[in-house]
Amino acid sequence: ALPARVRRQAAVITYANDANAWFPYFLSYYGRLFGVENIFVVTPVPEAFSDFGLGGVWSVKGFPFDDAARASMMSSIANGCRNYYVWSIVCDVDEIIEPAPWLGVNLREYLSTCEDSVLYTRGLDVLQSAAEPDFDFRLRTCEQRSIAIPNTALYKPHLARVEVNYSGGFHFCSRLPEAGSLRGDLVTYHLKWACSSIRAEVQSSVMATSYSDVAIESYCRNSADPRGSHPSLRLSSGELIRLDHPLMSQFSDESLGALCWAPERGLYVGDFKVAPFLVKISK
């Protein structure tokens, strides 16, 4: 690897079915922070990404979608980028990672002083209320959406400065977390449920995709249906709390305490959990 003083701060690696839906917002957010030339995309339609000035585009054109194969490929890209970058950020195109608002810094500023090996984020499914308009790509998530549901399926090791291998969905990685990596400084805003019109775009792309596995095909197609609401919303108590509320900390601690480790598997958990309350994310 190049010396740390000449390596760039972060390589952002994602998978995109196409250059529509959430990709423009993803590109705008991470491009402002790290530069579009440091964003790398794995995609079945490489020709759609030729004009963005990206750091690299890996083609999987003609192949069925395979979650494990995708994770393996993106792990290899991230580990290769580590020769030129201090950090790798591996996430889906609808995942926006921000430091907790009370820290008062952006992600670039946060990483510039962080020395952890792997960082986990606290994941929130962002919701669109009936009164909220379509998503505006010029605004931050917290400037246009008010509520979210904490979801441990989104407590992911998105950021690493050491070699890691990711599981399908990037839920886990091959490295045991350090004490500081689970402190909750970072939040992932998951945008799957954040805009009904974009969900319709996503559904169109999902329905046109071929899959290698019946289970992942069923999950992708059902979860992209724009007519549905978040499946756990009806189970929520309706209680609305702040992100820094003790209940949120308790939920995170309990969830992270359920993580297990096995050398042959890495980090894993038997069941994901969705919080019984809502979180206020608007300012």
Named regions from a protein language model:
Residues 44-91, 98-99:
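Active-site-proximal specificity loops/subdomain of glycosyltransferases
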Residues 28-37:
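Short, acidic, metal-binding catalytic loop of nucleotide-sugar glycosyltransferases
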Residues 70-72, 99-283:
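Catalytic-site signature of metal-activated, phosphate-bearing donor transferases
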Residues 38-44:
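Short, hydrophobic beta-strand segments that form beta-sheet elements in well-ordered domains
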Residues 1-24:
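N-proximal low-complexity "stem/linker" segments adjacent to membrane-targeting elements
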Residues 36, 83-85, 113-118:
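Short, high-confidence coil segments that cap the C-terminus of an alpha-helix
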Residues 25-29, 76-77, 106:
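Short, hydrophobic/aromatic alpha-helical segments in well-folded domains
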